[in-house]
Amino acid sequence: MAGDVNNEVNSKKRQGDTLAKERLLGLAEKIYNQFEEEVIPSVSLPSRTKANIEYSDESDVWVYGDRESERSAKTVKGAFQLLKTTYATDFLINEHLAHNRGSTLRELYYISEGWDYAKFKEQAESDRLIEDLELLTSLQREYFHMRPEEDGATMFGPIEISELTKRGARNIHCQKDVGEGGYQIPFNVENIEFKNHDASMIIAIETGGMYARLMENGFDEAYNAILVHLKGQPARSTRRIIKRMNEELEIPVAVFTDGDPWSYRIYASVAYGAIKSAHLSEFMATPAARFLGLQPSDIVEYELSTDKLTEQDISALRSELSDPRFESEYWKEQIQLQLDIGKKAEQQAFAGKGLDFVTEVYLPNRLKELGMV
């Protein structure tokens, strides 16, 4: 059985490598042909701005619209961008794909030190270029064997998986076979196969403190819940595994964050995608995900300990009123309420009501409101 899983995953990997090579070579060929035809080389990309985000009725997520920006050798800046694009493309084809190697985003920045004029000035520049290649090839960076620098998040709950590692496939029960930290989500979750589960819901949690509180209080057992620690703004792998569990296993998802504008964006990135990676929304976003809390109305109802909104918080909330991801009446009412009360609260504020309050009172009540229990 393990051998069959290995063969299947290895076959998919070879197919992915072949596709990535074809797409990257196609991009290089396009630029080369423009030189041959004595046309100033250029490539077009979707504009990565809030104004170019639109709702897809087909996939129920927010994607890029028709507005485009151009990378053209008409300008010195554009010429350097294309030069760096060709160097990176060559590296990915002849180092990563040809030799089954991989690099982190940080390593790519340092690797470019040997690229003469194509050297990146800062890592943000190399990160954007990989995003450009994703847009130009319609493939995720994992196809190029690019890894994120950050660790994946963790999850804990009643689900058994099979993960293909360099040492072969291994079966892991994410309650019985892991420590208190939970199962470490790998950067490429396509190497995971779901085996069995008894889960009734997935609770995606922003902070480590609340993740640990729910585990200590036995919430995963009481509600057959898979707990996922988002670690703040969630990594791609975290969003992808949530989407896969929701779509493939039909497990409902709720997102539990702090009660501030930055946390609402964490929910939005899980449910609808992020602006700078809207090209990946259909691959990573879970539009069925519900916002559990912490709501501004909870601050009022439960008289939670709060902090005063900063000017940056107020500006962010006002910006969200025009963000297409928050255009529903529910979000408009909650955001306006928060602006009116001028307060924000953390998840841990529930501890002021007792260590069991969040799992015995707040979450059961809120889950009933959402129709999840």
UniProtKB/Swiss-Prot annotation:
Name of the top EC class for this enzyme: isomerase
InterPro entries: Spo11/TopoVI_A (IPR002815), Spo11/TopoVI_A_N (IPR013049), Spo11/TopoVI_A_sf (IPR036078), Topo_VI_alpha (IPR049333), TopoVI_A (IPR004085), TOPRIM_Topo6A/Spo11 (IPR034136), WH-like_DNA-bd_sf (IPR036388)
Enzyme Commission numbers on file: 5.6.2.2
GO BP: any one term: DNA topological change
Pfam family, one: TP6A_N
Molecular function, one GO term: DNA binding
Cellular component terms per the entry's GO annotation: chromosome
Reactions the enzyme catalyzes: ATP-dependent breakage, passage and rejoining of double-stranded DNA
Reported cofactor(s): Mg(2+)
Swiss-Prot/TrEMBL keywords: ATP-binding, DNA-binding, Isomerase, Magnesium, Metal-binding, Nucleotide-binding, Topoisomerase
Active site: Y110
Domain Topo IIA-type catalytic: start-end pairs: 15-153
Family: Belongs to the TOP6A family.
Record-linked HAMAP family: Top6A (MF_00132)
Function of the protein: Relaxes both positive and negative superturns and exhibits a strong decatenase activity.
Protein name: Type 2 DNA topoisomerase 6 subunit A
UniProt lineage: Archaea, Methanobacteriati, Methanobacteriota, Stenosarchaea group, Methanomicrobia
Gene designation per UniProt: top6A
